[in-house]
Structures are given as structure tokens and as C-alpha cells.
């Protein structure tokens, strides 16, 4: 018996220090969090939002420990860096419902460490103990009983320059779940408004210098192969630069490369492809369910556990209900066009 268990990952939190951008000072407290002198909070999300809610969920983890309103956090997506690797898979990837599981501790520690440093900065500013301060709504509050500044607050943005001079604490205690304010509570989707108003940026909105666009015509059925295709009808259409076949185990189809997406899409609509079918291309819902019923009727399988007397229970039941449910194949796919961007360089 082999059992695989995913353990919480650990990451080294490094203080990135202060930088000046125009009139604003920016503190990169770690790879996931930046606080500006105007008290704006910026979260670098290292997982892809595909409708599953990481944009809101991951921001909530950070906001909980930092003590800020998730709705007031500006979210941007991370670039490529080993620090953003998925600790379950060992590489920078989003999938397998692992985003929160792999980042539960890391992102919370990023927020908690920053909060600790900000509280230290405020305590030193007021000349009081750190235990006499607490963070709330993007500010540190003075709670020292006998201090003249009791009840006053200093925003995170005002404290950033001081906190930027500190080392990241080695001990980063996290909140007890009984003290959670936003984790596990009702939170509105932070990306809902942008998606509803058409202002959200999707992967397909990527625009790089000299970028080309390609569409890929896939086989209509599993295991189909290209028998023939006529590129002559489309290769001279406006903007078309390349038309070629792809024959790989992971992908079979025709790629059309153009200067714009719409040019590639129009050419795709005019493309004629003849597909060679195989035994697998004849598989359909009817044949799949027929095989299921055949397999279910075969009782030669090994019984690994048996409890109770099912036959007797059914015979003596006052009422029995028999029903058969069938569900068609459901593709695990996004609603928007599947897409990706690649920047190929000579080096």
C-alpha cells in the first residue's frame, strides 16, 4: 500500500525593501505583497483564475492575516519565478484543485509576517510595546492604557518605510480559526464586477510586441487523423502567414497563423479538412452506456467488503424505489476560448 499526503509548503519570505515610483514609495514586503505609501495594498496572485475562485479565495487568505478588507486589495498576476511554485506539484502550475491547499500556509504567512513588521514599526514610532498595538482595516491602532496616543492609528502606508528596514520575523504565528473575520465567511467575488462589465483581462487579451495569432482546428472525434487538407483556399487570405499540420500524440490538427485573431478565425472557417477515422472514432454515448451495463451485469468482481443482508432488507422493505440515471460525458473545459501565449526568443 502506498499513500501520498500533501504537506503544507514552506517558502522563504524575503523583505524586498522600498522603491520610489514617481511620487509614491512602494514596499515589497515579500514576493506576494506590496504596500504603497498611499496605503494601497497590492497582492501578487501566483495561481490562475479560471472561474474556480482563486482570485477571491487567495486574496482572502492574505487579507485575513494582514487585517485588511479583501475588497480593497489590488490583485495582479505573478510572473514566472520559482518562489511561486505549487508546493504539491513542485512547479508553477494551477490545477487539481490545489491552489488553496498548496498556498494556505504560505499566503497567510506572507500577510501575517507583514502585519507583525507593521505593528513593530508603529510600536517603535509611539515608543510602546508591540503587545499594546493591534492591526485593523489597514492601520495599526495604539491600545496602550497609559499612553497619550491611545486610540490613535497609523496607516500601513505611513509605516511601510519603517517596516521595510526590518528583517522578516522567524516566528510567524497565524490566527486561530475562531478569530477568522473573512476566511469561511460570505465574501463577494472580487472579480465579479469586472467580468460582468467586460473590463476583466483574460488570457486571450494578451498583447505582446510583434505578436502573431494562431487558431488550431482539431479533429472532430477522438483518435481521428488528418487524411488531407486544402490550404490553397486560405493561405492567400489577408494576414495569413502560415498554415501547417500538427501530428503529435497530444495534438492532431491544422494550425493557422495570422497577424490578427480575426484573420486566423476567418481562415479557419474557410478551411477544408478530410479526417481519417479509426475504431475509436465510432465510440459514442450509446456504445459507452452499453458497455457500462454489460460491465455492471458481470458479478465476477472481487467483493472486498460486505456488511448486512441487502437481499433480505429489500425483500422485507415496505416500499422499494428503483431508478436508473444516465449522465452524458461532460468536458472539463472553460466557457471562454481556450488559449495561451508564448514568447519565443532566440536565446
PLM feature spans:
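Structural alpha/beta core scaffold segments of enzyme domains
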Residues: 1-347
Amino acid at each position: 500500500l502506498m499513500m501520498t499526503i500533501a504537506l503544507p509548503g514552506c517558502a522563504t519570505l524575503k523583505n524586498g525593501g522600498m522603491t520610489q515610483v514617481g511620487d509614491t514609495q512602494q514596499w515589497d514586503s515579500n514576493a506576494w505583497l506590496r504596500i504603497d505609501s498611499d496605503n494601497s495594498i497590492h497582492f501578487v496572485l501566483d495561481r490562475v483564475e479560471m472561474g474556480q475562485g482563486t482570485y477571491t479565495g487567495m486574496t482572502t487568505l492574505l487579507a485575513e492575516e494582514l487585517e485588511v478588507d479583501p475588497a480593497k486589495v489590488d490583485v495582479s498576476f505573478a510572473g514566472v519565478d520559482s518562489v511561486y511554485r505549487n508546493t504539491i506539484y513542485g512547479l508553477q502550475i494551477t490545477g487539481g484543485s490545489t491552489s488553496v491547499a498548496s498556498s494556505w500556509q504560505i499566503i497567510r504567512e506572507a500577510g501575517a509576517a507583514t502585519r507583525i513588521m507593521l505593528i513593530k514599526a508603529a510600536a517603535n514610532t509611539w515608543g510602546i510595546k508591540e503587545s499594546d498595538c493591534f492591526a485593523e482595516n489597514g492601520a495599526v491602532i495604539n491600545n496602550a492604557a497609559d499612553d497619550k496616543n491611545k486610540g490613535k492609528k497609523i496607516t500601513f502606508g505611513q509605516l511601510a518605510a519603517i517596516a521595510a528596514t526590518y528583517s522578516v520575523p522567524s516566528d510567524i504565528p497565524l490566527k486561530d480559526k475562531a478569530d477568522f473575520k473573512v476566511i469561511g465567511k460570505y465574501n463577494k467575488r472580487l472579480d465579479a464586477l469586472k467580468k460582468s462589465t467586460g473590463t476583466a483581462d483574460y488570457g486571450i487579451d494578451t498583447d505582446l510586441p510583434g505578436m502573431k495569432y494562431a487558431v488550431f482546428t482539431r479533429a472532430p472525434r477522438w483518435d481521428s487523423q488528418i487524411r488531407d487538407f486544402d490550404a490553397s483556399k486560405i493561405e492567400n487570405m489577408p494576414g495569413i502567414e502560415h498554415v501547417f499540420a500538427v501530428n503529435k500524440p497530444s495534438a492532431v490538427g491544422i494550425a493557422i497563423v495570422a497577424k490578427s485573431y480575426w484573420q486566423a478565425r476567418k481562415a479557419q472557417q474557410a478551411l477544408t479538412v478530410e479526417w481519417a477515422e479509426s475504431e475509436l472514432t465510432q465510440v459514442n454515448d450509446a456504445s459507452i452506456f452499453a458497455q457500462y451495463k454489460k460491465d455492471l451485469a458481470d458479478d465476477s468482481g472481487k467483493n472486498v467488503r460486505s456488511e448486512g443482508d441487502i437481499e433480505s432488507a429489500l425483500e422485507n422493505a415496505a416500499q422499494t424505489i428503483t431508478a436508473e440515471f444516465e449522465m452524458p460525458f461532460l468536458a472539463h473545459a472553460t466557457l471562454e476560448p481556450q488559449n495561451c501565449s508564448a514568447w519565443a526568443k532566440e536565446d
